[in-house]
Amino acid sequence: MPPPRRKNNGPIVALVLFGTVLLGVGTIGIIAATRSDRVSDAGYAGYSSASPTYTYSATTTTTTDTTAPSATTASKSTSTTPSKPPGPQAVYKLGDHPLFRGDLGTFDVNGCALPKMDYSPAGEDRFLQAALPCIEAMWKPVFQRTELPYQPVELQVFTGTTQTPCGSRQNNATAMYCRGVIYWPGGFYANEAGMPPHPGKYLGQLGHEYGHHIQWLSGMLKAADNAQYDAGGWDTRTGLELNRRKELQATCFGGMTLAPLSHGAIPLDVVNEGLSDASNRGDGSRTPDHGSTENNGRWVMHGHKTNRTNACNTWMANAADVA
């Protein structure tokens, strides 16, 4: 169910999108310049051997042909039986993904000890690394309940330029997620135009990036990439809409991440600042690949208030709700 709109725009038309087995393509990040043009991340969605997967082992049975003057033995053809080891497997679906069953929400944590914020790259790294175990504790049980694969996210705070499997990245742009790793530009958010630094901003953006990790682990990120490939690329009209659905879902998951923290784990003003920051990001006049500022605000608050994964099913939302 999408978040309530400020105005009544009629009934919602469901859009169900399914992934294929084709190779996915990554999306290109937009560097924010003004408050209305700020985007939350690059939204890269590439896959690698680090993605949840399994290997097949072959069991082969053969017989040898033998020929004698008095008899001939018929040969049996070689057979290979693939076997999938037990354990959680990613599900490459979108609107009907098992993560959207109705009883799933992030779990409360007994406090989250965060250091005093120091806006140097080293200080940002200490703060974010301290927050991650709290976020992992909220989300890991969700994956266990749905029998989906789980692994902790990695975080790299960098200065200058860094190389990633999704391409190079400079620290004059927003954070980027790629294949199990959050690449965080040291110093960028402390000097972002239009908004002074605040610890809540960092938690809000970390929640969004972790939202991409949820998509990657579950298989939705690959399914979305496949759907964009089928649509002719991420920069087609349909491809951009798919990208907005993906990014707004990460924003909604980010709102869910902030929900347990608002139950006394950290000061409430830090949570509120994280929600406010996410509510003031969007495409503005730039490439429409992350969603409007209004829709970013609606989805982050919807995720925060409901704390249910099915509330973040942007794949089933009306097109107006993901504009």
Task: Cite the ranges covered by each PLM segment.
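Pan-zinc metallopeptidase signature
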Residues: 279-323
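Acidic/histidine-rich, surface-exposed loop or edge segments in extracytoplasmic proteins
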Residues: 106-125
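Short helix/loop segments within enzyme catalytic domains
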Residues: 244-281
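Post-HEXXH active-site segment of zinc metalloproteases
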Residues: 218-243
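Active-site scaffold of zinc-dependent metalloenzymes
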Residues: 165-200, 216
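Active-site recognition of the HExxH zinc-binding catalytic motif
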Residues: 139, 204-219, 250-251
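Hydrophobic single-pass membrane-targeting/anchoring helices
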Residues: 2-101
